[in-house]
Amino acid sequence: MPDIITIGREYGSGGSKIAKELAAALQIPFFDKKLIEIAAKETGLSEEFIQEAEQRRTSSFLYNLSFSSRNLPVSDQVFIAEADVIKRIAAEGPCVIVGRCANYVLRDQKNCLRVFIHAPIADRIHRAKEEYGIPADEVQACVLKHDKARAAYYNYCLLYTSPS
């Protein structure tokens, strides 16, 4: 059995719930939003700021520049902090890690199972409406917006670590 399990997922697919249940069944630590909390403590940035930076990874150059304190855009600082946390957690022992491009960050990690959870759009819309209380007239746009943001985040991480 692999020591580390990374789970990527589409918004509304139930991936986080599946990951949490898997970690409980295997009796190993589960990391999802806890990664943001750890990265916030290590960088001195607030959890809210890190979440905002994740949402803006591909957008404004001026946004990145205006909040940068170490000659790196804030998006890069956040990615580096999260990647460091993911690598350290993986080195500490078996666990389930959800999102944050953990599958890519740990691409060279041996004994790591990488899983991606997806579901039909109609099921994801229904789940988002029921679990998150998103109004019926907004839920489809919300699901698609999250899909687009996650794809942009993942592409940002790939580009950030790719050799020039």
Listing of model-derived features with the role each one plays in the protein:
Residues 2-4:
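Pre-Walker A (Motif I) flank of P-loop NTPase domains
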Residues 7-18:
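Glycine-rich phosphate-binding P-loop
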Residues 20-26:
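A conserved segment at the C-terminal end of the G1
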Residues 30-40:
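Short beta-strand-centered segment that lines the nucleotide-binding/catalytic pocket of NTP-utilizing
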Residues 40-94:
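ATP-dependent small-molecule kinase phosphotransfer cores
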Residues 111-129:
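Conserved phosphate-donor/acceptor-positioning beta-strand/loop module used by diverse small-molecule
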Residues 142, 148-156:
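C-terminal accessory "lid"/substrate-recognition subdomains
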Residues 160-164:
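Conserved small/polar residues in nucleotide/adenosyl-binding loops
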